[in-house]
A protein has these predicted regions:
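Active-site beta->alpha loop and helix N-cap motifs at the rims of alpha/beta catalytic domains
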Residues: 1-4
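Alpha/beta catalytic cores of nucleotide-metabolism and tRNA/nucleoside-modifying enzymes
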Residues: 6-20, 39, 43-59, 63-188
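Glycine-rich, proline-tolerant flexible connector loops at the mouths of alpha/beta enzymes
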Residues: 24-32
Length: 188
């Protein structure tokens, strides 16, 4: 758990003839409680260049958007790529080339896409625990009126079909509420 262990561990890994090395710039003990140790990136690049120059080097830690990742690569020549981990939990559109604000409809459409991909994956590879999918609901369902109520209802679902039905019902109620609010504004 000592951050300095990377000086022996990374050379060992690089000697294993690996194609890609992803370095999470924190110890297991630190997890995400402290900022990523970007100060070690150039030293890690140098190790890779000396020991296994053909191994691709990917960095992970505190990268929340594609642009932040590209900036990190620009600041540290020799880094071949980045991995966005928890950043996607703050922004499900973290990989966009041109970041933009998204509507609730777009965000819920992305949730529906994740449901479709989940169904495709389980059809090809067998059933997965639906509970694991539920941890992603908060990514999409937050920051708008009734988000908490919708999240609570989503957590009570047991299938992707139930989630879709709930989202469809929410869409109808949301549209009705927006229309009601528009009429109230016009009446003023």
């Amino acid at each position: 758990n000592d951050i300095e262990t990377f000086r022996t561990w990374i050379p060992f890994l690089l000697q294993q003839d690996i194609q890609v090395l992803t370095v999470h710039l924190r110890t297991r003990k630190e997890m995400s409680k402290v900022p990523a140790h970007y100060e070690y990136i150039d030293e890690i690049v140098k190790m890779r260049d000396e020991i296994a120059p053909d191994t691709l080097l990917q960095i992970n830690g505190d990268i929340k958007t594609r642009e932040e990742g590209l900036e990190l690569v620009r600041q540290h020549p020799g880094v071949d790529g980045v991995m966005i981990g928890r950043g996607v939990f703050e922004n499900p559109f973290a990989f966009e080339i041109m970041p933009t604000e998204h509507t609730l409809d777009e965000t819920l459409a992305l949730l529906r896409l994740q449901l479709d991909l989940y169904d495709e994956f389980t059809a090809e590879f067998g059933p997965m625990h639906f509970q694991k999918l539920k941890r992603f609901f908060k990514i999409y369902v937050r920051g708008f009126a009734y988000a908490s109520d919708l999240r609570v209802a989503l957590m009570d679902t047991n299938t992707t079909d139930e989630v879709r039905a709930l989202l469809d019902e929410f869409d109808k109620q949301w549209e009705a509420k927006k229309a009601e609010d528009a009429v109230a504004i016009e009446a003023k």
